[in-house]
Amino acid sequence: MVAVIIKGNEVAEKKRAQLKEEVVKLKEQGIVPGLAVILVGEDPASRSYIKGKQKGCEQVGIYSELIEFPDTITEERLLAEIDRLNEDDRINGILVQLPLPKHIEEKAIIERISPKKDVDGFHPINIGRMMTGQDTFLPCTPHGILELVKETNIDISGKHVVVIGRSNIVGKPVGQLFLNENATVTYCHSKTKNIKELSKLADILVVAVGRPKMVTADYIKEGAVVIDVGVNRLETGKLCGDVDFENVLDIAGYITPVPKGVGPMTITMLLHNTVESAKRAGFICK
């Protein structure tokens, strides 16, 4: 058996086409979704990520605004800019590109963004709503992962999901999203002693640890859905995930590649959240 490859780039394109249609309808009602992105400093990786977000906005018709500051900006000045954007009716989503300089407290910045414009889904209020199963902005990468699994048409309810990784951005929230879908969820992390044995029990395995090709065939239950969130660059310059793709291909039922797997879905769900925010601001029902 050879696994079915879940092509995240194709799923993302399909969802962006749907978003584009929604944006056209919103514009007919005088509503233009707007996203503001704040970049502090000149980190090349951050600038690259932002270009992807700007391209996505352009693709679906979202107005985007890039606000740049030097890495010497004070926390007080950055907070003031967020306050301004919170009050700007043209802006439905505010995103501060992380990481920030060490003298700025990321927690304070994230919590200053209005929960109504927190399209990254990082604000504690939105995290709390997600935990309790309420309608809210879901964190983009976990939401993208859930959508990719749904593309397999597998009934998530009752399945055993194992998440390797416990970051606040991916690991913790993705487990909660699967729990909200009535899955049984097990978390594994650096202190878990029997990761291999636990992961082999997974109907759905999500790996997000940042260790190249850590997960091999002996971690995988036959026919499992394997979602690889890791993006690692080898000495050869080639990108690879946390899963040894070729090694796992013959035992998994479904698997995401790296690249063109989870990555394209992250930006797509950011666009989705921005459009949803515009609908809420304009009181447009789904």
Swiss-Prot record:
CDD domains: NAD_bind_m-THF_DH_Cyclohyd
Gene3D superfamilies documented for this protein: Leucine Dehydrogenase, chain A, domain 1, NAD(P)-binding Rossmann-like Domain
Domain of life: Bacteria
GO MF annotation terms: methenyltetrahydrofolate cyclohydrolase activity; methylenetetrahydrofolate dehydrogenase (NADP+) activity
Binding site for NADP(+): 165-167, 190, 231
Known partners and oligomeric status: Homodimer.
Function noted in UniProt: Catalyzes the oxidation of 5,10-methylenetetrahydrofolate to 5,10-methenyltetrahydrofolate and then the hydrolysis of 5,10-methenyltetrahydrofolate to 10-formyltetrahydrofolate.
Protein name: Bifunctional protein FolD
